[in-house]
Amino acid sequence: MNNGLETRYFLSAMTGAGYYALHRQFLRPPERYFCILKGGPGCGKSTFLKRVSDAGRAAGLAVVRLHCAGDPASLDGVYFPEKRSGFFDGTAPHTVDPALFGASGEYLDLGTFCRTEALDTARIRALNADCAMFRLRAQQYLTAAAALDARATPGLVYPEDREAARRRAKSVCAREFGAPGKGTEPGRCERLFLSAITCEGRIFFPETIAAHCARVYLLDDGCGLAEEFLRIVRAHAVRCGLDVLSCPDPLIPSRTQAVLVPSRGVGFLAGTPDDVPEGLTQRHIRLDVLPDPVRQRALRRTMRSDTRQQQLALASAVEQLRMANLLHNELEAVYRPCMDFAALTTFTDRYLRTFPGT
């Protein structure tokens, strides 16, 4: 990463497969050091993280912003690649602790600035229960949406179609990455969400692609063949000793939305032309022409019906997430009057002058 570069991701999200978290694999590499934040809702964790992020930017550091899928305007974490250190909100639902306290991380409890004895505990319990119910309903709609995914239509794709997609991927890999050298150490594969289904709808960070890549291969994914292509790209790049970013699909995380290879300035994205940032060189790989067109026409009515139903389920999921977020905002409002924000601000100013990440 270059100095001053800012990228954005999600480390966890609600998906059709349930709550899907990637934070443990991101926080645990032995060369990384994370300060784990603790504290309740409304205790200033996201504000603290934004101040840390801004301080890193002001110092000319590359900054990775890890957004909260429950409230995309908030942050779950900040990471400084050049310093191999960062901060992360280690509270539920993404509870985490340093693997080796003092060696791989430390704690920072912002809850110490909260007068817990003054809290309305009955109100807190009621709001938490209602919020959980809306999230459960959202999860049910997301599960239904995943089940209606047209890419999984029975009889749409045959084994020879998958093999044709893999052959195309191998050809592109040979051109972009060459062959693995003898004794080459495998590269590292980092998994991060480029997009998530949130209370504001689908949030996608195309500027992150632009920050890492000058060229993008846009892959058709109407028939689900992009996964075959991306799996080959990811494995080949890693065998060639290249570090890659593998981004799961926001609805079906067992699928892949994108594979980025920053050191080569190239990315591979399953999506539509609207997903490609302006100014990037684009090559369109038309994978949807591989399955037999007669077969596709025969299934078109079923696929269109499933797609319509899926969009309705997704809209309902977003509405449930919106209601959950409104209740979470009410929950934060219960905590705020009990917080000593003046003391927290003073502490933050002092802490930012001493933490090695900034």
What would you call each of these model-derived segments?
Residues M1-F26, E163, R167-T208:
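N-terminal pre-Walker A segment at the start of P-loop NTPase domains
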Residues N2-Y19, D54-L119, R123, A237-A315:
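Conserved nucleotide-sensing/catalytic segment adjacent to the nucleotide-binding pocket
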Residues G4, E160, P356-T358:
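Extracellular domains of the immunoglobulin superfamily
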